[in-house]
């Protein structure tokens, strides 16, 4: 933790009763909350959205908000304000979400529907150029020949923000576990900016606000480079980041050395959380002040993990990046 932002009291009220779900602090950190939909809520939600296959959500974007409203109504309209309060709260900003009874790859479509409902209670998920949809599903196997670290199992995927190489604002990231076979390791890694002991050193550096070039590999289906600084501030002047080590392209020696030192300082932080995410659960984080990554897996010839992601913007927030939109 550093002196830039003190941790506030956790918003979880032990005496608060919610309708349709429970909420507790996680074992890893009071910043990360665990939200669990009850079995009754889960079953009623799936019954009420059964008429719409995932393809309908892909083709008719307004249905994504419709399923969100159904879920919120089942939770006595307590869910949407709770999600927004948590994700916009600098002291928290992260949720591990679970629905009782959704825990098998055979329910993959139900997982997409649930995650879509939650995401569209806080904003809208952006078009994902890698998949051509508002979400992306991808598989990690024991052998990988792709052009980024996304699917490479036997190394750490370094901490980063999403949306660094696109022009759309990326306020939130949702990462869901759809399937897992012959897996050991591979926990999600999270770092809250205010728990990074070197934040002040790098945030105050002259290069922190210099626009840098970000370019994605061919698999991302994005051909246009974007330019923005690694650091920015929110409306209250607090540090936020748009950073990924794989895609930032330093233009000279000075930038290259600084970025290398930045990467080392992030990866060696004592504030990193290691979070197991079982099948059917998903992480939902504020992408402006949480970095995320993945630990390495233990090799196995039949290793398989399938993930689903959504990333988008908050429809109810006014504090995006202040100087570089």
Swiss-Prot record:
Listed cofactors: Fe(2+)
Binding site residues for Fe cation: 160, 162, 292
Cofactor: how and how many bound: Binds 1 Fe(2+) ion per subunit.
Top EC class for this record: oxidoreductase
Keywords recorded for this protein, A-Z: Dioxygenase, Iron, Metal-binding, Oxidoreductase
E.C. code: 1.14.11.64
The keyword Kinase is annotated on this UniProt entry: no
Gene3D superfamilies in alphabetical order: Clavaminate synthase-like
Pathway: Amino-acid degradation
Xref: Pfam families: CsiD (PF08943)
Molecular function, one GO term: ferrous iron binding
Swiss-Prot/TrEMBL GO biological process terms: L-lysine catabolic process
Catalytic activity of the protein: glutarate + 2-oxoglutarate + O2 = (S)-2-hydroxyglutarate + succinate + CO2
Subunit structure of this chain's protein: Homotetramer.
Physiological role: Acts as an alpha-ketoglutarate-dependent dioxygenase catalyzing hydroxylation of glutarate (GA) to L-2-hydroxyglutarate (L2HG). Functions in a L-lysine degradation pathway that proceeds via cadaverine, glutarate and L-2-hydroxyglutarate.
NCBIfam families xrefs: PRK02963.1
Family stated for the protein in its record: Belongs to the glutarate hydroxylase family.
Protein known as: Glutarate 2-hydroxylase
């Amino acid at each position: 933790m550093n002196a830039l932002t003190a941790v506030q009291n956790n918003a979880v009220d032990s005496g608060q009763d919610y309708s349709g779900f429970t909420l507790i602090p996680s074992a890893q950190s009071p910043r990360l909350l665990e939200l669990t939909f009850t079995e009754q809520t889960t079953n009623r939600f799936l019954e009420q959205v059964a008429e719409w296959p995932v393809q309908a959500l892909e083709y008719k974007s307004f249905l994504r908000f419709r399923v969100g409203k159904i879920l919120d109504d089942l939770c006595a309209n307590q869910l949407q304000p709770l999600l927004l309060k948590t994700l916009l709260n600098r002291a928290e900003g992260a949720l591990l979400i679970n629905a009782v009874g959704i825990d098998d790859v055979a329910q993959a479509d139900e997982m997409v529907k649930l995650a879509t409902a939650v995401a569209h209670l806080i904003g809208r998920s952006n078009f994902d150029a890698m998949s051509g949809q508002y979400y992306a599903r991808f598989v990690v196997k024991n052998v990988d020949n792709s052009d980024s670290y996304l699917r490479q199992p036997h190394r750490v995927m370094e901490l980063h923000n999403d949306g660094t190489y696109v022009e759309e604002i990326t306020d939130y990231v949702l990462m869901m576990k759809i399937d897992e076979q012959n897996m050991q390791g591979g926990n999600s890694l999270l770092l809250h900016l205010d728990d990074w002991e070197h934040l002040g050193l790098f945030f105050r550096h002259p290069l922190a606000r210099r626009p840098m070039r970000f370019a994605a590999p061919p698999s991302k289906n994005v051909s246009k480079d974007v330019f923005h600084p690694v650091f920015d501030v929110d409306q209250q002047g607090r540090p936020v980041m748009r950073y990924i080590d794989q895609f930032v392209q330093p233009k000279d020696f000075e930038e290259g050395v600084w970025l290398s030192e930045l990467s080392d300082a992030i990866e060696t932080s004592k504030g990193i959380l290691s979070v197991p995410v079982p099948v059917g659960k998903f992480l939902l984080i504020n992408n402006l002040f949480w970095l995320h990554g993945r630990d390495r897996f233990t090799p196995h010839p039949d290793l398989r993990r399938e993930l689903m992601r959504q990333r988008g913007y908050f429809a109810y927030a006014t504090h995006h990046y202040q100087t570089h939109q």
